[in-house]
């Protein structure tokens, strides 16, 4: 009986953790951001989650992230340099993605 309960609890934990990681990059980011960034792992630039964690206590996170995407730079990360507007993101894509990134760690 204990092994059945343990199996149920373990399975429930795996299902719940799977939901937490099941965030896909929005279409606005796949073509222009996905070359250098992923949701949960560093590629050439930091993961979207790492950026979100960096700004999670900042009420102006989305606007700061948008400014960083717009002007480009390294932003204190130890790797990579982001070109201005990434691979050509327009203003509406930048605003959408900035809010998406800022909200990941909330």
Q: Which residues are covered by each model-predicted region?
A:
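Axial heme c-ligation environment in periplasmic c-type cytochrome domains
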Residues: 35, 44-55, 68-96, 104
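Bacterial N-terminal signal peptides that target proteins for export
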Residues: 1-9
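Sequence/structural segment immediately N-terminal to covalent heme-attachment motifs in c-type
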Residues: 22-40
